[in-house]
Amino acid sequence: MSTVLPEDSVGLVTPQIARFDEPLALACGRSLAAYELIYETYGELNASASNAVLICHALSGHHHAAGYHAATDRKPGWWDSCIGPGKPIDTNRFFVVSLNNLGGCNGSTGPSSVNPATGKPYGADFPVLTVEDWVHSQARLADRLGIQTWAAIVGGSLGGMQALQWTITYPDRVRHCVDIASAPKLSAQNIAFNEVARQAILTDPEFHGGSFQDQGVTPKRGLMLARMVGHITYLSDDSMGEKFGRELKSDKLNYDFHSVEFQVESYLRYQGEEFSGRFDANTYLLMTKALDYYDPAAAHGGDLAATLAHVTADYCIMSFTTDWRFSPARSREIVDALMAARKNVCYLDIDSPYGHDAFLIPTPRYMQGFANYMNRIVI
């Protein structure tokens, strides 16, 4: 890319690392004696620390949400379309914090980190995590940054679950929750997709029970298959049909089982191979389990309205018409529960052909609705 950065970019950014030496008790019954969180910030924190916005990432996300690490970077952060001057999360107004969650593989302590007790990577011995664990670790980061109350917490997909959980766990520390393309818990179908993906990894001979780093190998085939399965669920049938149809890679069929014949096959293999070269298999297992386990209403007999009775935040819930992974009906479950609990909520169902991935794609109505809500937040 050009060395001249776009005017609406947050510009060049440098990741920072916060180290915590206080033990963090986890839902699984174990604890981490010490850990690190990598994060980035965009914009300036005001004198009263009232303009802070937390970005919570989805399954394969990370801390680099906006801007560039170098002027020669080919692409900006994963949500650059939404974060920056004049964008929905306007860095002329807000101080934005984006982190890589605990258990991740982009700089925060996770399975690929060295376990100080053994001198080897944690691997499969890294504790199983929950959305609630992430929220507690994020609260410690907020304390470290001098942020008592977030102006808003924003997330899509798994990130939306974290945003919702913040309002439940720390109701006095969140003024606005923007929950996009999410759900209050996974359906049986979603859990099933995650299990297929996990089995692809667990049965890869190179997985070695999660200790593949000790063996100097990577379960790339399992990760590739997991990503291919997941990626299908992120797209709509219409968008796949429009993009690929039944187009062939060449002008004829090969009548074998090994050739890549259809364009959609080539695309999925590319996505899987690219992902398997940058993501950690144990982190993938952790992230999908955190998704499966999330069910905040379980503590109230499945009554989500009762679960949300004590929250104080205002909510913006957004869904996308062709998202079948987290359908609009799942977002409306949250909206209905908030209304039953007599909370302030606005809901926008956006017509988009892009399926679950629509929360990453800056279509006009999405950007307008997102910006309209963020602009009304008083800082």
UniProtKB/Swiss-Prot annotation:
Assigned EC number: 2.3.1.46
What name is this protein filed under? Homoserine O-succinyltransferase
The entry's active site is S157 (nucleophile), D323, H356
Per its UniProt entry, what is the enzyme's top EC class, as one word?
transferase
Domain of life of the native organism: Bacteria
| Site feature Important for acyl-CoA specificity, where | R325
Q: Which reaction does it catalyse?
A: L-homoserine + succinyl-CoA = O-succinyl-L-homoserine + CoA
Q: Which gene encodes it?
A: metXS
